[in-house]
């Protein structure tokens, strides 16, 4: 009988990763492109669904594409794509489905179960939305766990289980930021405190570079790239590349040949950004990570001397400024021994192996990130479960009526740390009716909160005298009904095989169209006048051949043409760069610097 795998999935804002435990060892499953991470991007073209790298390449040029959908999870917002409104759960489900499909192929068997990670500061609605996305993708989501907790699990896999360690996890991903403090002792991982910012991540650093590039191009090249979607797509891609380069080097060169066409011909952009400039323009983002670091220490009532390890998680922690700030605040050298892009998925896979009984003597005790309570008289919140309470947990408290002869009460559930209900998030409400008339303060209403291992909450109110009770499971206010979820599961299943069959074809065609368009722009540019007529005819012939292959959907020949095409573009870019350097040898010295 084949072993039952449980997937560990890090469903990220920017990238997603899937892994399993095989023979006691974590294994990252590569996608069809041979990459260990998959961009969390979805696009539609010609009625087909495209996921990952190919979708990312057409983000700005294709209006039917979307990224960073994780930022909308748990909200009522929708995205309009392919002539249809999609809920965030549906888009996330497409990413999960894609990952499940290639995991099935890598493992040689269908996999149904998964542990999916979420930021520690995700609220109840966001967790429900994530679980629904998994269901739509055809997965049995056996557990939702916090990303920093998963990272600590991965770190502690081969550690001495009898060794007591307090671990701080600094998790800066593409779109979210968490800090968690955990204690590891005798195989038990207990979360002591957590804090963070659901709207801070590497995307924000990229955006600052894009803004800087726009201003530089306006000033130096008399062109506004914000008016050209294709140009902005290339700027965003180059911004991310520059950020990555600046994590390793002091200077990043930005080369964007044929960025666009204006009245003077092609716009060939050459810029240079230093690490100092980059760190200066993003200092305000960096400082937003400081307070959560201090908050978790205060919440756990510990000092920095009590902390044994500081783990860096998330690709954005590769930035030197981030590492420096963490070291300065904690007075400890951060541990980056585990790949920050993969550690969360590995931890999720470990949790799956624990649930499957493959890994023994390890217990994970997670916490609820925010206080849960109910509204009492005067809009005041009565807290029942304080933030950072270990879950699963059940707590009860007795309340009473506010006026004489009251026969019904409304239970309003809140989430947050403020004293008044209006300053917190309202998760839901329900009525308990049939209370026997009595003077105010006499009836006894028992309110119970129960949070399960996935962080999902159930609230019950019971009249102690009549035994009448009402229960509500706190759902995402924008969550899908059971019927909607079932329909989406069927839709996803029905389209999965067809999408899988055509995905590769679409990816190749999209890339061919993009390259063909780039070369056509080159032929129409002023600098094309430097080419002889035979060269122009040769290039036009290649464009025509590619278009013909696209119409025929001859994928094999298209792939060969694309390879040749990319080589020609690289040669053209190098030629133009040298030509520009010869004509303007002092260009690099004229770039303004930001102090």
From Swiss-Prot:
Q: What induces it?
A: By stress conditions e.g. heat shock.
Q: Which Pfam families does its entry note?
A: HSP70
Q: Indicate what this protein is called per its UniProt record.
A: Chaperone protein DnaK
What is this protein's gene name? dnaK
Question: Which NCBIfam families does the record cross-reference, listed alphabetically?
Answer: PRK00290.1 (NF001413)
Residue ranges of the region described as Disordered: 573-595
Concerning InterPro entries, the annotation shows: ATPase_NBD (IPR043129), Chaperone_DnaK (IPR012725), Heat_shock_70_CS (IPR018181), HSP70_C_sf (IPR029048), HSP70_peptide-bd_sf (IPR029047), Hsp_70_fam (IPR013126)
Q: Which UniProt keywords apply?
A: ATP-binding, Chaperone, Nucleotide-binding, Phosphoprotein, Stress response
| Gene3D superfamilies assigned to the protein according to its UniProt record, in alphabetical order | 1.20.1270.10, 3.30.420.40, Actin, Chain A, domain 4, Substrate Binding Domain Of DNAk, Chain A, domain 1
What positions are modified (Phosphothreonine)? 176
Its biological purpose is as follows: Acts as a chaperone.
Start-end of Low complexity biased regions: 582-595
Q: Which GO terms describe its molecular function?
A: ATP binding; ATP-dependent protein folding chaperone; unfolded protein binding
Which HAMAP family does the entry link to? DnaK
SUPFAM superfamilies from the xrefs? Actin-like ATPase domain (SSF53067), Heat shock protein 70kD (HSP70), C-terminal subdomain (SSF100934), Heat shock protein 70kD (HSP70), peptide-binding domain (SSF100920)
Give the protein family: Belongs to the heat shock protein 70 family.
Looking at the record's lineage, which domain of life comes first?
Bacteria
């Amino acid at each position: 009988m084949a072993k039952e795998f449980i997937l560990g999935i890090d469903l990220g804002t920017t990238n997603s990763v899937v892994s399993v435990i095989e023979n006691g060892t974590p294994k990252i499953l590569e996608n069809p492109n041979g990459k260990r991470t998959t961009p969390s991007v979805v696009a539609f073209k010609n009625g087909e669904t495209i996921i990952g790298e190919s979708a990312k390449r057409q983000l700005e040029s294709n209006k039917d594409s979307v990224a960073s959908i994780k930022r909308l999870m748990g909200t009522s917002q929708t995205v309009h794509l392919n002539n249809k409104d999609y809920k965030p759960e549906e888009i996330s489900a497409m990413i999960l489905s894609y990952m499940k499909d290639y995991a099935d192929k890598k493992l040689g068997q269908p996999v149904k179960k998964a542990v999916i990670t979420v930021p520690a500061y995700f609220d109840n609605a966001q967790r429900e939305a994530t679980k629904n996305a998994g269901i739509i993708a055809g997965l049995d989501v056996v557990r939702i766990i916090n990303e920093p907790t998963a990272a600590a699990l991965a770190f502690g896999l081969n550690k001495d289980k009898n060794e007591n360690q307090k671990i701080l996890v600094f998790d800066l991903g593409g779109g979210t930021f968490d800090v968690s403090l955990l204690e590891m002792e005798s195989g038990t991982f207990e979360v002591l405190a957590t804090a963070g910012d659901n709207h801070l991540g590497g995307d924000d650093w990229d955006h600052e570079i894009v803004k800087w590039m726009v201003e530089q191009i306006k000033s130096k090249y008399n062109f506004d790239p914000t008016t050209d979607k294709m140009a902005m797509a290339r700027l965003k891609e180059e911004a991310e590349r520059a950020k990555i380069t600046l994590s390793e080097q002091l200077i990043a060169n930005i080369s964007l040949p044929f960025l666009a066409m204006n009245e003077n011909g092609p716009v060939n952009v050459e810029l240079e950004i230093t690490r100092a400039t980059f760190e200066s323009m993003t200092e305000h983002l960096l400082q937003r990570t400081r307070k959560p670091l201090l908050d978790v220490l205060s919440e756990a009532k510990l000092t920095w001397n009590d902390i044994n390890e500081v783990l860096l998680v998330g690709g954005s922690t590769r930035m030197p400024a981030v590492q420096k700030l963490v070291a300065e605040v904690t007075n400890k050298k951060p541990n980056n021994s585990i790949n920050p892009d993969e550690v969360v998925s590995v931890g999720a896979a470990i949790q799956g192996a624990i649930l499957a009984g493959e890994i023994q003597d390890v217990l994970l005790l997670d916490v609820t990130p925010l206080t849960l309570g109910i509204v009492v008289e005067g809009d005041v919140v009565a807290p029942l479960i304080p933030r950072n309470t270990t879950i699963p947990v059940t707590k009860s408290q007795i309340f009473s009526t506010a006026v004489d002869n009251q026969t019904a009460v409304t239970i309003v559930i809140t989430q947050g740390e403020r004293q008044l209900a209006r300053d917190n998030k309202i998760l839901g409400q329900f009525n308990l009716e049939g209370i026997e008339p009595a003077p105010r303060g006499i009836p006894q209403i028992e309110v119970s909160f129960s949070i399960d291992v996935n962080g999902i909450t159930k609230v019950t109110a019971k009249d102690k005298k009549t035994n009448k009770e009402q229960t509500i499971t706190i759902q995402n206010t924008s969550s899908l009904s059971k019927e909607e979820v079932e329909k989406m599961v069927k839709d996803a299943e029905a389209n999965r095989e067809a999408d899988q069959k055509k995905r590769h074809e679409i990816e190749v065609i999209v890339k061919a169209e993009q390259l063909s368009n780039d070369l056509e722009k080159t032929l129409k540019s002023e600098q094309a006048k430097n080419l002889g007529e035979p060269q122009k005819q040769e290039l036009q012939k290649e464009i025509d051949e590619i278009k013909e292959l696209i119409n025929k959907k001859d994928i094999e020949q298209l792939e060969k043409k694309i390879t040749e095409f990319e080589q020609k573009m690289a040669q053209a870019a190098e030629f133009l760069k040298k030509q520009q350097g010869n004509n303007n040898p002092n260009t690099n010295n004229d770039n303004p610097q930001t102090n």
